[in-house]
UniProtKB/Swiss-Prot annotation:
CDD domains assigned: Ribosomal_L1 (cd00403)
Protein name (record): Large ribosomal subunit protein uL1
One cellular component (GO) term of this entry: large ribosomal subunit
Gene Ontology BP terms: regulation of translation; translation
Species this chain originates from: Thermoplasma acidophilum (strain ATCC 25905 / DSM 1728 / JCM 9062 / NBRC 15155 / AMRC-C165)
Keyword entries, A-Z: Repressor, Ribonucleoprotein, Ribosomal protein, RNA-binding, rRNA-binding, Translation regulation, tRNA-binding
SS bond partners: none
Gene Ontology molecular functions: rRNA binding; structural constituent of ribosome; tRNA binding
InterPro entries, per database record: Ribosomal_uL1, Ribosomal_uL1-like, Ribosomal_uL1/biogenesis, Ribosomal_uL1_3-a/b-sand, Ribosomal_uL1_arc, Ribosomal_uL1_CS
């Protein structure tokens, strides 16, 4: 499978999918084969920085000291202190609302143990345990990268979906994003591309188009 295979499929979904009244996301569906998903070691759980970004904003939440909070304001979407950990531990319903909105969490390294103990049961199953950041470090570069990062998580299923952009993005840029994701996933599979049955690309409301490897029309 090469970039030209991907470009053909992306061009087809953009041509055949009518314009909607909202910005559609573009995602790929990866179908694996001959992989024992009952073994956690075989599951895909990757965070992938897209070279051309996601095409849309995602929210980032930060837990930190006063210094980190000050640096994160205006860059992160949610900023919390150590005192908020205990508050959220007592009000899990309120915290779940934040978790449903934030795509990634960042936490000062010194707070990680407390967050794991108090909020891990909410964050863990959703794959949203915070990324630790050293005390005093500027969080802005990490936040910028995370806003352009996607998660590829198979859990225990042979089929999983990964966002790769939005419909309004240039087809070449979407294709480059897709190749980045495919290359990462392929590199994590025991037999590489031989463990991939098929890959489809689609917009939110559009029909899926298979990316056919080696199709040189």
């Amino acid at each position: 499978m090469n970039i030209n295979d991907v470009k053909r499929a992306v061009s087809e979904i953009k041509e055949k999918s009518p314009q909607r009244k909202f910005e559609e996301s573009v995602e790929i569906a990866v179908n694996l084969k001959d992989v024992d998903m009952s073994n956690p070691k075989n599951r895909i759980n990757e965070e992938i920085l897209l070279p051309n970004g996601r095409g849309k904003d995602v929210k980032i939440a930060v837990f930190g000291s006063d210094e980190l909070k000050s640096k994160a304001r205006g860059v992160a979407d949610f900023v919390f202190g150590a005192e908020d950990i205990s508050k959220f531990a007592e009000d899990k319903k309120a915290f779940k609302k934040i978790v449903n909105q934030a795509y990634f969490f960042i936490a000062e390294a010194t707070l990680m143990a407390n967050i794991g103990k108090s909020l891990g049961q909410v964050l863990g199953p959703r794959g949203k345990m915070p990324r630790p950041i050293p005390p005093g470090q500027d969080p802005a570069p990490l936040i910028k990268n995370l806003k352009n990062t996607v998660k590829a998580r198979s859990r225990n299923a042979l089929t999983f979906h990964v966002p790769v952009g939005t419909r309004s993005m240039d087809a070449d840029k979407i294709s480059e994003n897709i190749m980045t994701v495919i290359n990462r996933i392929t590199g994590k599979l025991e037999r590489g591309a031989s463990n991939i049955r098929s890959i489809y690309v689609k917009t939110t409301m559009g029909n899926a188009v298979e990316i056919k490897a080696g199709d040189e029309k």
